[in-house]
């Protein structure tokens, strides 16, 4: 056979095979299959059968059967099997259908056997099925069947059989080539999704490649991805997250697979996913599918799923050319992360939210940490996309996103520093471009601190930032400078470049630039003492303390001859910088103050600067005092000592109104006092005796009242006011000096009280000048107005100001205030003798003043500019905690004793100060708030028996309300009434940081409920206790509550329907009264709105969960469907509670205005949420099981509670609004000039009514659609309120055109012969119109089901206008008739003289079909042909009457309407507003 085949003698070959017995052929075939020449024999054997001979075909089929049996029993290599099957496939087209069907059945038997070594069927079965697909009908086992039916049956049979795990990959390869339909692909993928859970990691990549290749759409791709996510979570990530959350790891556990195998499999799968989807699926296709999981962070934010999505982004595939702004998946991931963070926040404040969520929120920090660790091991498949995702988070507007991004980048750069330069370059560019956003500079600063070496190597970005600092604003430059400062410790190049930029800024003409230079130089001075650098030089001096950042700057390299003295480097660099700062002492007022502030901070943090700073500041300080030197002076009492106020402030005009403010001596004294205090710790390097002598002179002369002061008595001038402010700051600076030098051995603190008395006198003088300055300023303006030659300019340093006297600004910083508070409040202090502090502690004005200044200073921390970065300042945090501790321990814990035995105003100021401390810690140090509380409240530490701060405040509030709660005089005091308000604000902040699992959270709610139940509040500002009560209620308790609150509001405000059934009011809150009713109502609105927002979020989440139920394998569908039903039940229960609350609120007589608008907005949001829930049920449940699911999820119960009662109350509420809006008697006497204002008021108070009715009707429409789908006996529409509203938002242009056509037709018809007859017919027709109108309103909703589907018509905004009824219409004493066609025409004729006003914007208009549309001429045109003639005759007669009536009646109406007073009747509700017909008269 081989010889004949090789010589192409095929005729002889056919004859040979024909003459050879079949057994011989089978035996030869079986013996040659395993040999290398087996494919040759098989080829010639198949070639030798004549396809036109039946005997040859039968013999060939026997050989094929033997061949197929041999494949199952003989072990062949994959190449041999593939070659043999491929050769057989070439001749399959010549096989009869019955033989092909046998081959298919044999292949299926091979699949059932599950032998991984015999998988030839995977290549043979698809070809055989494709051939059968085109064949005509054939007999199979005696049954006639066509190819398509056989193919579908075969695929269905394969999909339902049990697949052995060993042949899953060949089966997937077979399905990939079978050209399956979309439904079959989904079925097969679901089958594989359940089967792959049992595979080993080494078997997964090959199978996943086949599955990914099989997917042609994104909705198919998500099926294997969800299965793989489940696989890796169960086998790897679940254990990994458990180990990360626990302190110990179970090293004795034996896992099925190693972590290395799982990670390698995951990495390979991600590579296949990227390759298989690169050209088939775009980001847009994936985003359309993935948006169904937008509100399911637990599905998307897992390590595998996150990696899979990132691997399919264009920015990950081609990071060099792809633009991040064109990405679609990265914004999607950002939104998912945002939703997850919102879920974490919402779960902390809602127990219903936590119970409905049924799981914990995703800890994204853990997920990102895992991805960083995997990336560190060399798994770089998703590195570009992951980094750009973090960039998206950084560029968002959410602070939480910024925190996540900065934390990730900090960890990522530490472990993958090779990517550092690219990251630093991009962020630095964004920092320059987006100057109004602070997150970029903050990120660079934290990166610079976390990995200084990596950032210091990015010289090009640093140089670019330094170049831009020269032309950017000063504040922006200071913000950008913060990330460069940590680099100065290890980089001489950066240091010298920064100094060069600062030198240029110092010589700039702009004040902001020079302030930036001062800030930068002082930051350099502050860091000169740090010594953690080794890289800057190779000499031994690099390890010395003072040589840390100094090195050799550009200006000192030429002056140094030896490097053996590192102290010399420090001194020279310091002197260089201070020498440049010395020039600031001769510059403007703002520059000097900025220098004092920044130098003081540098000195406090680097004490070795003090000798150099004192040398510079000494002569400047002496220049403000006129006194002889210490050698020339005699007795101190007789020595001349005077302050040179002309060096501080001067006037450039005779009237002393244009002043020049040169310096602030008080701030200078405070700065010098701090320098001297630091110098006294190590007094060497400079002679400070003269400075101390001048300070002593200031103290002694001021205490003895012998220091000459400028004239500050009225009449007031601008100069006098400025001098008083200077003297106040001088006294404050002297007090700082006394506090800093005070010791138990000296009498420094004894001199504080006389100085404060002088301070109080100056404040009184300033108040007198302030009163006189207003009159003086007014007189000067009048003089300037009368005399053209004189001018009145009130300027400060050339800048016009509005007032002469401004509020004094205290100069004490937090450190001074801390010492003052300890001095005044503590029994014993380390820096003063106890007997010397008695007078100070008993002085009420001093205590009040210090507490007031402390409160304002602590508040100012929150207002500091971003560049100071106080949120990261440990020093400021320590000072804040110290102040809070002394206030809490000495005032708050003893507050009843304080207001009884000392002063009520001081107690109120103490509570204000404590509240400001908590607010500042809450806003500025939110991450450290727990540490902040532990620093002053020792009871918060475990094991302490003291009472926690929350309970302390509650007890103090109880004491205050018991003693003063009913005292009107105390509660009406403008200042003292703030005491309980400040305590409540403090309690609210503390409760905000208490976890819902903490016992204090539940007990605080109980206390708040008791507080509101037993205390009547006389102060409206204390109404915030209701907000606290409502928030804690939602945080800790489930069930109905707010309906009881709404019922009690009805007792205070009154109700519309007294006969409305109401339950007994179990909850009685005395705190709800006429004083607090408005704030309580607003807080109740906020609570209900939060509940509606939560429900709306969960409706969307339920839609996402429903989609997931459709794509998970069947084995998991029961579990997820159970979760969906549970979520639906929880949603319906919550909406029932909300609806009952709104049912009560709509019956309350709420005042019109913002309170009524708030209720209407709640109703709109409520019905919008109900519509979303109804749409969810429409899409989630099939008609077979829907009614059972609807009953089990309480949706039917919800309709019973909401469907009829709430709309009826809303319509009555609309009547109530109209009755209070349209006051007929007031309109009669309204002047013409107030008409427009009254109309605007009416529109403003009724503008939300059409929207409320629209959402109700929209909800009813969706319930009708759901009722049709369920096809249940108990129709859901039976629970609906039968509204009377139809087409309330009609298309005005069509209506106007129809009316004009009717009028023009009526004028062309003669009315002389049949005027009376036509009138009678017109009246009859009008009655018919009314009857049709009534019938129209009663056909809903039963007849509406038989009508055509509604169509949505989009109108242009310019065309949607509505005419307003004229004022005469409201004043018409005649009863109104229902609007038929005639009334509509008359109304249009009267409205043509009025100004058209735009309707509220509504994009989509509901257009009803024939049975619901108004009877206009346009609707007549669609009648049947046989009905049109008679109808047209009726139309011509009907249009005649209105035309005549319009020509006769206008004069009569114009004359009689203004003079006839309207009778006081019950207001007639307008049908335009959708009032129920049962309310009409």
Curated annotation (Swiss-Prot):
Belongs to the Fanconi anemia group I protein family. It is a multi-pass membrane protein. This is Fanconi anemia group I protein homolog. The gene is Fanci. Residues 1423-1447 have a biased composition (Basic and acidic residues). GO terms for biological process: DNA repair. The chain crosses the membrane at residues 211-228, 299-315. Residues 1306-1481 are annotated as: Disordered. PANTHER family: BC025462 PROTEIN, FANCONI ANEMIA GROUP I PROTEIN. Keywords: DNA damage, DNA repair, Membrane, Transmembrane, Transmembrane helix. Plays an essential role in the repair of DNA double-strand breaks by homologous recombination and in the repair of interstrand DNA cross-links (ICLs) by promoting Fancd2 monoubiquitination by Fancl and participating in recruitment to DNA repair sites. Residues 1314-1335, 1342-1352, 1387-1400 have a biased composition (Acidic residues). It comes from the Eukaryota. Homodimer. Part of a Fanci-Fancd2 heterodimeric complex that binds and scans dsDNA for DNA damage. Interacts with Fancl (via C-terminus). It is found in: Membrane. GO terms for cellular component: membrane. GO terms for molecular function: DNA polymerase binding.
